[in-house]
Amino acid sequence: MPNTTEEQSDEVNNLALEKCLKVLQEAQTDNEQFAALLLVTKCAQAQEINNETRRRIFDAVGFTFPNRLLFSNSVPEGCPQNLFKSLGITLLACFSTDPVLAVHPQVVNKIPIFNETINISCQSGNKEVVSMVEDAYQCLLGILASPQGPKNLLSHGSIPYLCQAYMNRNHFWEKALQILTSLLTVLPPKCWKKSCTDLQLLLTRLSEEFGKEEGEWKFQLADLLPIFLPPSPILLETSWGKQCLKQLCKGLLKILSNKLSISQRDPALKLAACLANSYGSSWIMAENKVVRSRFLALIVNLACVEVRMALEEPEPLTSRQSVITACYALVEMGILACTKEEKHPVLGKEQKLQLIGVMQEACAAIIYYLQQVGWEKQEDPFLLASVRLLGAWLAEETACLKLEVIQLLPFLVHYMRTCHQRSVICSKLPKEVSQVALLSNSWGNIWPGDAIRFLLPALCHLSAEEVPRKVLISEGVPALLCDYFQLQWDVLFAEDEPEGLQSAAELSLQTCCGVFLNLVVTEPTFVGQESCFVSLMKLLMQSLPTLLTKEGHLVLVANFSTLGLMMSRLLAENSVLHESNAEEFFKAAIHFLSHSHVPSCQTDAGKPVITLSESYSEAWEEISELWFLGVQAFSSCVHLLPWLSALVLRSSWLQDTLCLLDNVSPKSVDSDLVTALQGMLTELAQSSSCCRDVIREKGGAEKANLYGMAALEQCLAELS
């Protein structure tokens, strides 16, 4: 039951407020309005006034009177200096709690005044000034709550003032941090672009506090700091950024080295995951290598334990999904730290072995989780995060958990197909319609992601092994990847796609080629009979000539050329290789194969030393195997496609190769290159009399003897 005394008190207050409102409505002069407003503010604070009363005050006053109060330069004798300004801001604070009034231009254009007000010194504890500062924050918060609020605050320069309010620990600095948190959550890149220096100083302060703090504020900072990290990974590039990372590491080490409650530990794991996503393990800047390696091992071990505890339960808790997703990022950091080659690795061999063991257990838990709930929860974003980490593990290690992985493959293929089909549907719609399509499902406006991309490196490994390869074929993976290949090709050179997405598409295309090459080598009969490979061959024939005209894609050119040449051996009798664009493909392939080696400025015995051309030398580590395989595959195609030898002559590849061998020092040509060129020259000599004549005219027999090309020498002798 309500307290009778409280009811009577409320009734008295309401009556008093009604009288004040009546006086306000009947006021004829500024002095009368001013006196009535003082009475109103004494009867009710802005946050205690209901919408109806607030509207009545606004109807009685409007914006004209508050504007005059804000810009008045004089106050009655004996009154506080900020009296009029304080009352004007109080009125606007009252109005700004109304969503309609908060977006009114007369409120929005006062943001600069609110910005200055929150940094007025209140050291003397002046109640009127403190109240004015609080009201200014109420105005900023009211504006922030509107749809355009963050943009309005940003465009009116609020961030430097909010940062200053926090740095100086002015009254209500907590509200400054609250508003900054909201702005950086909604508009992180724009905030950093507009106020980079101020946010740098703020992040430096927050990091220092996080490194030194011992109380509850440390855990609150762990929760806030991910929002204040710059959207682009610049911390490793600057001295101030590195100092921030040192302080963050110091604070995280203190937290994670102790036994804490879940609510205290989870924010620390999430902060570490944010740093891992941007910087891998490079963000760990401990005082020395020993501490750094221990800290890295500690984080990864903790993450693996959290993953196992959450996913090995018969009914995994959905409430833990956000922190487990963070732990996935930390485990992925551990995978990279254990597998990448470094001159000065952070982890020792024993540490790596220990971490590989716990990460394997965590991945086993993910497999168990996917087996239990995967088919039922395909719309759950957490499922994609789980598949991503499993893909990262399988990209490096397929020997462990092999049986479990093979059993899971049908689900993984189904999941990849589901995500891909949805991607195809949305890609064919106008962007506006596509967004509506996304909003109509449980993902909200977040695209579910590219499950195939996450699993492609694993598929490359698995397709090289017989048992999993048979499963992949039976589940229709080749046809799925052919469709995916087409989609990624479309993304690569689309005009309106983000650069990051195009880079990912290029990498996916390269990895797809690796999977297809495995199938071509291990399952030639299947490839020769499966219609999807005919479609793939058509796409390669169309795309390689186009790709050659674009700069900076030599690795992809190598993949397309070699894959197409390897497939041509198996599809030689298919009509696809007798279409008009087949010749254009082989011209492009010849261009790739023929521009790799050139004479250098260095000499040996008076002759230039053979070397790689500039563009090829930069990518040779990635493309050398593809180049040698491509030459071998091209040589095999010569006798299968009779028209190919004439194309070689028209391209001058044969003549240029013989000229190169004539001009360079034989000692500088390594045996692998000699073997590759001998195979090509021998096939051309056997298949075409015209090519044979050119070889003889260019001193082919002498070169064969000089370079130890016995097969070519014998061929020329037998066919003389």
UniProtKB/Swiss-Prot annotation:
Domain of life where this protein originates: Eukaryota
Keyword Cytoplasm appears in the UniProt entry: yes
Keyword annotations of the record: Cell projection, Cytoplasm, Synapse
Example GO biological process: neuron projection development
Compartments (UniProt record): Cytoplasm, Cytosol; Cell projection, Dendrite; Postsynapse
Function: Probably involved in signal transduction, in the nervous system. Required for the spatial learning process. May also be involved in neurite outgrowth.
Record-given protein name: Neurochondrin
Main location: cytoplasm
UniProt cross-references to InterPro entries, sorted A to Z: Neurochondrin
Keyword Zinc in record: no
Pfam family, one: Neurochondrin
Entry's family note: Belongs to the neurochondrin family.
PANTHER family, per the entry: NEUROCHONDRIN (PTHR13109:SF7)
Organism name: Xenopus laevis (African clawed frog)
